């Protein structure tokens, strides 16, 4: 006879790998062309001057320079630019 009741399987116990999103280069930091500035889902930050936007909304530097964060427009959107 069994002395323990049979353990049922659980439906939990899974978790997705973290995606390492967020700001990679902060305001005032020097960047080289091609450096990733922000990894994001959607456009939390928008591309400003000398900043490109990737297929997954990643923002990256198009030229060498310093990162500049600014809030612009009627909707207070956050823009990231590169000042040469």
UniProtKB/Swiss-Prot annotation:
GO biological process: translation
UniProt xrefs under PROSITE patterns: RIBOSOMAL_L27
Originating species: Shewanella frigidimarina (strain NCIMB 400)
Name recorded for this polypeptide: Large ribosomal subunit protein bL27
GO MF annotation list: structural constituent of ribosome
NCBIfam families registered for this protein in UniProt: L27
Cellular component, GO annotation: cytosolic large ribosomal subunit
Keywords: Ribonucleoprotein, Ribosomal protein
Bilayer-crossing regions: none
Pfam families named in the record: Ribosomal_L27
InterPro entries in UniProt: Ribosomal_bL27 (IPR001684), Ribosomal_bL27_CS (IPR018261)
Similarity remark: Belongs to the bacterial ribosomal protein bL27 family.
SUPFAM superfamilies xref list: Ribosomal L27 protein-like
Region (Disordered): 1-22
């Amino acid at each position: 006879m069994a002395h323990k009741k049979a353990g049922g399987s659980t439906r939990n116990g899974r978790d997705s790998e973290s995606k390492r999103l967020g700001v990679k280069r902060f305001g005032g930091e020097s960047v080289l062309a091609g450096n990733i500035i922000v990894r994001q889902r959607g456009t939390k930050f928008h591309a400003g001057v000398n900043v490109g936007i990737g297929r997954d909304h990643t923002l990256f530097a198009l030229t060498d320079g310093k990162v500049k964060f600014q809030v612009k427009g009627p909707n207070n959107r956050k823009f990231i630019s590169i000042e040469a």
